[in-house]
């Protein structure tokens, strides 16, 4: 996406020099002087790019997608940017389908999300066991999908950002010396502030 649509998207963002709008009974007038386009997830690691020596993969696991990019010797390789429609929402749907097949009932997605984020929720053990089992399987599939994009756990470091990092952290089997999970929910915003300086 970045390579093929970045110029068009930047032109779209810069189509107006000034934007005027009202929000909560206050008028705003903004002068747009430029726009920078970055790969998804990049802002969350931009400040620490100096740490990305050798071969690395960045995976931004969001609600609907996983955005992937290689970073080689501190240089993002935008030619390796790709997106997999395999985010946390698909995991929640899969879990609820399994619960429906097994117990002929469903669990509210907020309860499933609580288990995915924290590893536990106030539910019967039989439901918790299904959620954990499915989350472990889904996490294995995430790591397999990264391999399709040339991730090699023995020769690369993996940096995970985004809310879906909790899946890997809580249910994944990985080498903690080679996989780094940034679970700061403000990492992207902090990164954009850093890039704007």
Give the location of each predicted region.
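Nucleotide/phosphate-binding catalytic cleft detector across ATP-hydrolyzing
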Residues: 1-56, 76-90, 110-197
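Short hydrophobic alpha-helical module
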Residues: 44, 71-74, 98-105
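Gly/Thr-rich phosphate-binding beta-strand-loop-beta motif of the actin/hexokinase/Hsp70
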Residues: 48-77, 95
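Conserved ATP-utilizing enzyme core subdomain
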Residues: 86-109
């Amino acid at each position: 996406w970045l390579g093929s649509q970045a110029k068009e998207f930047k032109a779209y963002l810069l189509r107006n020099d000034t934007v005027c709008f009202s929000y909560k009974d206050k008028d705003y007038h903004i002068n747009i002087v430029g726009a920078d386009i970055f790969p998804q997830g990049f802002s969350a690691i931009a400040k620490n790019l100096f740490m990305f020596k050798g071969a690395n993969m960045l995976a931004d696991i969001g609600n609907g997608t996983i955005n992937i990019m290689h970073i080689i010797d501190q240089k993002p390789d935008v030619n390796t940017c790709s997106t997999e429609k395999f985010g946390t929402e698909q995991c929640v749907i899969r879990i609820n389908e399994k619960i429906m097949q097994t117990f002929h009932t469903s669990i509210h997605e907020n309860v499933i999300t609580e288990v995915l984020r924290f590893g536990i929720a106030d539910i019967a053990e039989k439901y918790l066991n299904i959620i954990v089992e499915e989350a472990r399987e889904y996490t294995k599939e995430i790591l397999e999908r990264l391999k399709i994009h040339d991730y090699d756990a023995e020769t690369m470091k993996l940096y995970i950002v985004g809310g879906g990092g909790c899946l890997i952290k809580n249910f994944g089997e990985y080498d903690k010396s080679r996989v780094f999970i940034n679970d700061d929910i403000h990492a992207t915003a902090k990164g954009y502030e850093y890039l704007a300086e």
